[in-house]
Amino acid sequence: MNIKTFSIGGIHPEENKLTHEAVTQVAALPKQAIFPLSQHIGAPAKPVVQKGDKVKVGTMIAEAGGFVSAPIFSSVSGTVFKIDTAIDATGYRKPVIIINVEGDEWEESIDRSDKLETVEAHPDLTPEKIVECIKNAGVVGMGGACFPTFIKLTPPPTAKAECVIINAVECEPYITADFRLMMEKADEILIGLELLMMGAKVTTGYIGIETNKMPAIELLTKKCAEKFNGSKYNVEVVPLKQRYPQGGEKQLVDAVIQRQVPAPPAIPVNVGAIVQNVGTAYAVYEAVMKHKPLFERYTTVTGKKIKNPGNFLVRMGTPMKDLIDACGGMPEGDNKLLAGGPMMGKALTSVEVPICKGTNSVTVISDVEARRKEPQPCIRCAKCVGACPMGLEPYLLAKISEVQNWERAEQEDIVSCIECGSCQFTCPAHRPLLDNIRQGKSTVMGIIRSRAAKK
């Protein structure tokens, strides 16, 4: 087996894949669903419903607020309670639509059957129609970045797509939602990949999976041979070394096709690759073949102190508390609640934060694990430099961010940081490297945007 990986940096944190074998359960409907209007990169969605309106499962409740945006659909049936603000996964109050749940009535246009729909059975499908279906269904990147999928399939004239790479790496500790999705919905994922290749007008596809998911590698390799042998598509399952952050977009492109994505504003399609999460491929299948907009997703609920950790198919808008309760409740003592995993997840201030399009995990870290050690002076060991998958100097970026030298930070390429946390994980002095770099990167990007707007 030819095992590939990226060329610079990387670490190997403890996996803690506690729910690896936990078959996906369908989460119970919430009593009240909360839909933030910013569930994607770009402009927030605009409400198209009002207080008192009746909605069904699959009803559009907010339309795209601009070109880089995505519509939002109700995952429940019921009555719009109010349009208000609530704390979302960012920790800030953001506009939301709140719906009181009444029954489970779906829009009639959605195909709820288990029949596998193939591309061959739909000869009328064109690249333009596929992209339009994806756009209208509100499909975004399901790996956490939440970039509208249709935009990736329509690159600028200066870039030419050569392949689609499915990101099935799931290198973040604890999270197993993508693994369970692959084991349970392999056929649908491959049809989703086929649709993505059609939409991008390419015939080459790759599925990158880390070697700690051998059952998924074996299953998808077998399914690919059955589906694509003799077809015009060349699809390969690529086994990848267990190495964090193997699932980073640039690291995945490096590992799979040995091409380096330049610094921002360059994106993978500038070197010929369109990267989509495996959950996105499944959402594309459902959007195009089942006329089902994006309103539910596979999510892991996990933590060493969680009584019954598991994987769930959960309707968006469901409060995290409902999922934690379904797993036995919040453990006693002090805990840290994360939307996502321990490396790149966001710490939350409330268990009422709802599941959104990008929520791949609800992770509960116990007080002992969560407590940071007291930062010590830098010992100049350069471990952070060796760990950085972007070839940056984290100790330097953190220091110049701390003293607010934004011009120097931009010169040192702070905007190339992918915020993976490898530097902070490996630092023996427990320096808050990522904290400072993240703040510095945000400030520098704001300065760059402001400068561009004046031109």
Please describe what each predicted stretch is.
Residues Q50-E63, K82:
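Short, well-structured beta-strand-loop connectors
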Residues G78-V80:
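Conserved hydrophobic positions within beta-strands
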Residues T203-M320, A326-P331, G341:
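Hydrophobic alpha-helical positions that pack around
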Residues V164-D178, K305:
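Gly-rich Lys/Arg/Thr-decorated short loops/hinges at beta-loop-alpha junctions or inter-strand turns
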Residues T359-P375, V385, P389-K455:
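Ferredoxin-type iron-sulfur electron-transfer modules in oxidoreductases and energy-metabolism complexes
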Residues M1-V48:
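N-terminal, Lys/Arg-enriched amphipathic/low-complexity engagement segments
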Residues I87-F147, T158, M214:
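Acidic low-complexity segments
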Residues M183-M198:
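Histidine-anchored nucleotide/phosphate-binding helix
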